[in-house]
Amino acid sequence: MGGASGTLPKVAMLMGGPSAEREVSLSTGRECARALRGQGYEVVEVDAGPDLVAQLNDIKPDVAFNALHGRWGEDGCVQGLLEWLRIPYTHSGVLASALAMDKERSKAAYRTAGLPVVDSVIAAKADVMARHVIAPPYVVKPNNEGSSVGIYIVHEATNSPPQLSEEMPAQVMVEAYAPGREMTVTVMGDRALCVTDILTDGWYDYEAKYATGGSRHVLPAEIPDEIADLCHDYALRAHQVLGCRGISRTDFRWDEARGADGLVLLETNTQPGMTPTSLSPEQAEHVGLTFGQLCAWLVEDASCER
């Protein structure tokens, strides 16, 4: 996608915003803006807020690079706004973004595609704190928040139900705990890049994802070819059944003792992190793309109505 007279497009870097993941979004936006400038693009950094429409009208960008995370940025809201303004934007569109953000509905889509998922129920927060709504071990998380914010693990020997924070919504997802290795695959367009094995001291939480040294990434994962092929296939099918575009990242758990039957899909992230410790840029680099080239590819892939 080119700007006026065949020049590189002018890019508005949408970052920050009001969600719980604001700080990660700011980090993502700064890194992507720096990388794009290194590729020759003019980039204007925009801290997305109530005056976003006025800011975009003033900037008149050719492309909006969506570096927002969490609510409003990856749930279809800002995508709908950009469609209304007719500004081509990166990453997934309105429907795919909204669907992926809603864990219950995205699981329903995965099931229709024959993808293996973990059993779960949606329950009232009050009920979850009063009793075990499913047998431990299980995980409690918001149905529509990302980056493992507010996730609770209830272990098998736990007698008392979890006491959830005030930040947790009135309705939460209670999901059977999936044992095994945490792995992830980035899809770029119609290509699954590689499998990363994520090694941490415990649950892959918000700190492990975004803090330097919070986790160790092994790529390609040291797993049998059969499992790697399944991860690639499942990630690509998840990307397609949700209707994603640009890049997405799908997370898995694999219980080695059960072989191929032990691989389950956890969720797909339509706005994967783009920070120095992020998984998708590492996978792109593994297949020969620099961070700057990955960001430039996203800009060239930007569009409306798909």
From Swiss-Prot:
Its cofactor is Mg(2+); Mn(2+). Its EC number is 6.3.2.4. Keywords: ATP-binding, Cell shape, Cell wall biogenesis/degradation, Cytoplasm, Ligase, Magnesium, Manganese, Metal-binding, Nucleotide-binding, Peptidoglycan synthesis. One of its GO terms (cellular component) is cytoplasm. It is found in: Cytoplasm. It catalyses: 2 D-alanine + ATP = D-alanyl-D-alanine + ADP + phosphate + H(+). Mg(2+) 2 binds at E267, N269. One of its GO terms (molecular function) is ATP binding. Binds 2 magnesium or manganese ions per subunit. ATP binds at residues 134-184. Coiled coil: none annotated. Its main location: cytoplasm. Mg(2+) 1 binds at D251, E267. It is an enzyme of class 6 (ligase). InterPro entries: ATP-grasp, ATP_grasp_subdomain_1, D-Ala_lig_Van_CS, D_ala_D_ala, Dala_Dala_lig_C, Dala_Dala_lig_N, PreATP-grasp_dom_sf. Residues 107-300 form the ATP-grasp domain. It comes from the Bacteria. GO terms for biological process: cell wall organization; peptidoglycan biosynthetic process; regulation of cell shape. Pathway: Cell wall biogenesis; peptidoglycan biosynthesis. Cell wall formation. NCBIfam families: D_ala_D_alaTIGR, PRK01372.1. Belongs to the D-alanine--D-alanine ligase family. This is D-alanine--D-alanine ligase. The lineage of its organism: Bacteria, Pseudomonadati, Pseudomonadota, Alphaproteobacteria, Rhodobacterales. The gene is ddl.
